[in-house]
Regions:
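Conserved catalytic core of nucleotide polymerization and phosphodiester-bond processing enzymes
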Residues: 1-216
């Protein structure tokens, strides 16, 4: 904690000390000392300040979804590549690839217009309303875009002679001849090739060659 206090902007520390009573009432400080909570919150705020484009997208997508839920059949945008529309009982977030994320039974509740949709709750495994917010929605979209890029790369690899025998999260495992005709450098290049909808995205793949599967 002392090291964090020295490293962060003093104004962030003071700001979070001012939020401490609120955090205690909300139960956010359970399991840690008040000073530890202030330290953690100050680090989070410092990250947000240093990554303002990301936090702006959190807010932008959150606002777009709230507007769309309250105004069916109208398209709202977030950032340069995302659009949102409520149609019938579903909220659609259109990704850069054209694929859509679908949130069933979207609704706004409470004074803060908290967003909910129906899904399988993580712990109870029951179908119920799930709260969400801008940051979580951007996380969903980011993971979906990564999935789209991986799926785009699959056929490209196989057309070049890299037979995919297994996928693990964001990895493709290919079986190739034990000679010089193919190698992991070529595979990296194929996986880093951007589709037109992702133009300008900084995408890099890293791989290795081995006689058995392992984590790098």
């Amino acid at each position: 904690v002392p090291a964090i206090r020295k490293a962060v902007d003093p104004s962030l520390w003071i700001q979070n000390e001012g939020k401490l009573d609120w955090a205690i009432k909300k139960g956010l400080v359970e399991g840690m000392t008040p000073e530890t909570w202030v330290a953690f919150s100050s680090v989070a705020d410092a990250w947000r300040r240093a990554n303002s484009h990301i936090t702006a997208l959190w807010e932008g997508l959150g606002n777009a979804c709230q507007e769309a839920i309250g105004t069916p059949n109208r398209i709202f945008t977030a950032g340069k590549k995302l659009s949102v529309k409520r149609q019938g009982a579903y909220l659609y977030v259109r990704l850069p690839s054209g694929r859509k994320l679908v949130y069933p039974a979207p609704a706004l509740s409470g004074e803060r217009c908290d967003m909910t949709y129906y899904g399988i709750e993580q712990y109870s495994k029951k179908w119920r309303p799930i709260k969400t917010y801008g940051g979580r929605l951007v996380e969903n979209a980011t993971q979906a875009v990564a999935c789209d890029l991986l799926l785009e790369a699959g056929p490209r690899l196989e057309e070049a002679g890299y037979e995919i025998v297994l996928s693990v999260h964001d990895e493709y495992i290919c079986e190739i001849p034990d000679d010089e005709t193919r190698n992991h450098r070529q595979m990296e290049e194929l996986m880093s090739t951007l589709p037109t909808w992702a133009e300008g995205l900084p995408l890099v793949a890293a791989g290795f060659e081995s006689y058995r599967y392992r984590k790098e």
